[in-house]
Regions:
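Membrane-interface helix-loop-helix junctions at boundaries between adjacent transmembrane segments
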Residues: 52, 85-94, 108-161, 172-185
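Alpha-helical transmembrane segments of multi-pass membrane proteins
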Residues: 31-45
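Hydrophobic cores of alpha-helical transmembrane segments in multi-pass inner/ER membrane proteins
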Residues: 2, 59-76, 128-144, 191-198
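Intrinsically disordered, flexible peripheral segments
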Residues: 51, 55, 167, 181-190, ...
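Hydrophobic alpha-helical transmembrane segments of polytopic
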Residues: 26, 30-33, 61-64, 94-102, ...
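Membrane helical hairpin/interfacial module
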Residues: 57-101
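Short, Lys/Arg-rich, polar N-terminal cytosolic tail immediately upstream
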Residues: 1-19
Length: 198
C-alpha cells in the first residue's frame, strides 16, 4: 500500500467538520504547549540547570511545533480538496504558514545550539519561531471564529487568550532588543545569556 493510497483513505475517512475542529484545536493547544515549554526553559535558566538542545523543556516546545505542524498538514488536505472558503480558508493558510516558519526555525535553533551552545531569548532562530507561534494562534482563532460549530465556539475565549500570550511572549523578547543593556542587566543572571543576539 503506497503513501498516496493511505493519504487518500485517510482524507476520505475524516469529515471536513471534524478536520476543521482538529486543525483549530491543534493550532491553539500546540501554541499553548510551546509557550509553556518556552517559559519552563526560561525558568530552568534561573535555576542554573545544565543546558543542551534536547532538554525536556525543548522537547515540550517542539511537541507544540509538532502539534501545529499536524494542524498545518490537516489544513493542507482541506485546502487541496477545496473544502474551505473565506475566513476559514484564510485561517487555515495562516496556520500552515506559521507551522512552516516554526519547522524551519526549529531546525535553525538546533543548528544554532550545536554551533554556538547556549543562546539567549533573543536570537536569529527564536524570534521567527515565536512569530510562527503567533501565526498559528491567529489562524486557530480565525478558524474557530468563522466556524458554525457551537462546541468549537466554546474555545473562542481560550483562543483569544492564547493569541494574547503568544504576542506578549514575542513582545517581551523584542523589548530586550529595544532596551538593550539597560533591560538585560537585571535579567542577565536569570536567563544566563538571555540578551545574546546572534
Amino acid at each position: 500500500m503506497s503513501a498516496v493510497t493511505i493519504f487518500q483513505k485517510l482524507s476520505q475517512t475524516f469529515k471536513p467538520r471534524l478536520v476543521i475542529s482538529l486543525v483549530s484545536v491543534l493550532a491553539i493547544f500546540g501554541t499553548v504547549v510551546m509557550i509553556s515549554g518556552g517559559v519552563w526553559d526560561a525558568i530552568s535558566h534561573a535555576l542554573r540547570e545544565p543546558e543542551f538542545f534536547w532538554t525536556i523543556q525543548h522537547i515540550t516546545v517542539y511537541t507544540g511545533v509538532a502539534m501545529t505542524s499536524s494542524a498545518g498538514i490537516l489544513g493542507s488536505i482541506l485546502i487541496i480538496k477545496k473544502q474551505t472558503n473565506g475566513t476559514l480558508k484564510k485561517g487555515i493558510k495562516i496556520v500552515i504558514i506559521g507551522s512552516a516558519i516554526q519547522i524551519i526555525s526549529g531546525l535553525g535553533d538546533s543548528i544554532s545550539h550545536d554551533i554556538f551552545g547556549i543562546d539567549g531569548l533573543v536570537s536569529w532562530t527564536h524570534q521567527p519561531l515565536e512569530f510562527g507561534l503567533i501565526l498559528s494562534a491567529l489562524g486557530g482563532f480565525l478558524i474557530i471564529k468563522s466556524n458554525n460549530n457551537q462546541r468549537l465556539k466554546k474555545f473562542l475565549p481560550f483562543s483569544i487568550l492564547t493569541l494574547i500570550l503568544a504576542i506578549s511572549w514575542l513582545g517581551f523578547n523584542l523589548s530586550l532588543l529595544v532596551g538593550g543593556p539597560i533591560l538585560c542587566l537585571p535579567i542577565y543572571e536569570m536567563f544566563s545569556s538571555g540578551c545574546a543576539i546572534l
